[in-house]
Structure formats: C-alpha cells, structure tokens
C-alpha cells in the first residue's frame, strides 16, 4: 500500500508506550463505544484517504464535535457540518481555539447532530422509500 503504511514503526513505538492521556482500547462493545465518543471533547480524524468512514457517523451520533482533514469526499457527504483542516499545524490551532471557545465547540457539536440526522435510519428510510416509489411509478408507465 506504499504511502499508507509510511511511519508504521514510529507509530507502533508510540502505541507500545503511549503518553498518559492516550490509550488504544482495541475492539470495544457498542456500549463502550458510545461511552468513549461521549467522553471526547473533539473527534479528530486526520486521515489522508477514506472511503466512507463509519467512525465519523458514530462520533456524530454521540454528538461529538468533528474535525477532519479537508478532503473532497467529506465536502460531498457531510455538507460542511465539521471543521475542515488542511494540515497538522491548522489542526493544532483549531484544537487550541476550541479549548478556549466553548461557544465555537458547541456550534461544532450542533453540526455533528446535523450529520447524525442526515444519516439516521429514519431519514435513510425516507430516501429509499421515495426512490422505490419513483421507480415503481416509472415502471407503470
């Protein structure tokens, strides 16, 4: 996979001996997952490549404010309901901003709720029902 595994050894050392404020829980139950997301002041996904990351939907459903790398994919599927950052320096600045501005963090949390609503089971059901009804109507013509 080339570039996707760059830095593995470096990060493996960190995982083997993490700082006190960082832990790697491994596979967790859905109940524990909700608890962990709810504990987060901010959900950060700095990934360079993604398809459709479920972690974002999980975090949004737990009302965790979301910060992501500025990828074209996110613009399309999340409709701006997150904080986009271009690099680690900008991520750091944004984290410090949110640390000192609870209103901005609250706004980001509300945006997470919008993501959650957009991808809720109820909303997706509405979209699929509309689609199938339209297809059925076309088939009757």
Residue ranges of predicted features:
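Nucleotide-activated donor-binding/catalytic signature segment of Leloir-type glycosyltransferases, i.e.
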Residues: 11-28
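Short alpha-helical donor nucleotide-sugar binding micro-motif in glycosyltransferases
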Residues: 27, 35-40
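A short hydrophobic beta-strand element within the catalytic core of glycosyltransferases
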Residues: 43-44
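Aromatic "clamp/platform" in nucleotide-sugar-dependent glycosyltransferases that forms part
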Residues: 48
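Short hydrophobic beta-strand element within catalytic cores of glycosyltransferases
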Residues: 65-68
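A short, well-ordered alpha-helix in the C-terminal region of glycosyltransferases
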Residues: 104-118
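C-terminal alpha-helical cap of glycosyltransferases
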Residues: 121-141
């Amino acid at each position: 996979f080339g570039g996707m595994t760059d830095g593995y050894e470096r990060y493996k050392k960190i995982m083997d001996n993490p700082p006190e404020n960082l832990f790697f829980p491994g596979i967790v139950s859905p109940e524990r997952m909700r608890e962990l997301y709810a504990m987060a002041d901010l959900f950060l996904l700095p990934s360079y490549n993604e398809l459709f990351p479920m972690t974002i939907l999980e975090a949004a459903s737990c009302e965790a404010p979301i910060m992501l790398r500025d990828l074209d994919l996110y613009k399309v599927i999340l409709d701006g309901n997150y904080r986009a950052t271009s690099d680690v320096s900008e991520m750091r600045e944004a984290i410090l901003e949110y640390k000192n501005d609870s209103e901005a963090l609250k706004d980001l949390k509300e945006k997470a709720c919008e993501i959650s609503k957009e991808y809720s089971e109820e909303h997706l059901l509405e979209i699929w029902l509309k689609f199938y009804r339209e297809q059925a109507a076309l088939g009757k013509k």
